[in-house]
Amino acid sequence: EPNLEPEYGRTSIVPAAMELPGADLYISLAAHPGRPEVLTNWMDPSVVSEDDPLSVDPTLDPFDEEREIPFTKEFVDTYRQAQRRRNDRITQWARTEIDRVVAAGHHDRLFTTPRLWADLRMIDGSIDPNNREFPSCYLGEPQRANYGIYGVGTVSSLRTWLSMWSLSDSQCNAAPHLARIKIPALVIEADGDSGVFPSDTRAIVDALGSTDLTTHTLEGDHYLRDREGARDDAADLITNWVKDRY
C-alpha cells in the first residue's frame, strides 16, 4: 500500500501517486541508497557560506595540500557529521524561504548548491575499497569537479530540495521503503564504481525485505562504459533472472 507523506506546506498527496501500480520484481543496477544520502555523502562540508562557492573551512577541507591520505578515522567521522549538518542547514533555510516566498504570493524559487563532488571515497581508495580508479568521480578529477558548475543537485527549487535531497524531509531515502519490498529482488553492483560504493550496495541488500534475493557484481564502472560488453552482460543477467521467475 502507499507509504507517502504530504510534502512541506501541503496537506495532501498528489492523487496520481496513490494510483501507481505495484511492481512484480525489484531490480537495482549500480544503485545508491537514496538521493538524500548520496548527495550528502558527496557534498563538501567545508563550505562556509552557501553564497560563496570559494569559502572554505580548512579544518574540513579534504583537498588541503597538507591533508594526509589515507584520511584518519577521526577526520572521516568528523567530515561525515559535518556533511549531514550542511544538509540540515540547507533544509532549514529552504523551509524558511518557502514560507517567505508563499507569504509574498509566489510558489517557489531556484537556488544553487555548490561543491558536491567531495565524497572522501572519491579521493581515498582505502575507504570502502573496490576496483575503482582514484582520485576520481563521474566528472573526472574530484577537486576540479567540486569547484566546477556541473553536478547532480547543483540547481534546485526550494520544493525540489525538500522533496528530493533533504535528509529529514525527502521520501527518496530508500531504507524506509526497502523493508516493505517482499517481491523477488536482484541487486547488481559495478566493481569499479567511483560514486556508488560497496557499503551502499550492502545497505540496499540488508534493508530489503525480500526472501528471494540475488546479488551480483559486474566488472566495470558505474555506467558500464569502460569495459566492452559490460552492458550486454548486465542485460543478459537481468533477462535470465527474470526468465527464471516468469
How should each PLM-predicted stretch be described?
Residues 237-245:
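C-terminal alpha-helix
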Residues 181, 187-189:
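Short beta-strand/loop motif that positions the catalytic acidic residue
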Residues 220-232:
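Catalytic histidine-centered segment of alpha/beta-hydrolase-like enzymes
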Residues 191-193, 219-222:
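Acidic beta-to-alpha connecting loop that harbors the catalytic carboxylate
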Residues 11-137:
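Alpha/beta-hydrolase-fold enzymes
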Residues 11-14, 159-177:
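Active-site nucleophile elbow and catalytic-triad environment of alpha/beta-hydrolase enzymes
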Residues 36-38, 170, 194-200:
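Conserved alpha/beta-hydrolase "acid-adjacent" motif
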Residues 40-44, 183, 197-206:
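Short alpha-helix in the alpha/beta-hydrolase fold that links the catalytic acid
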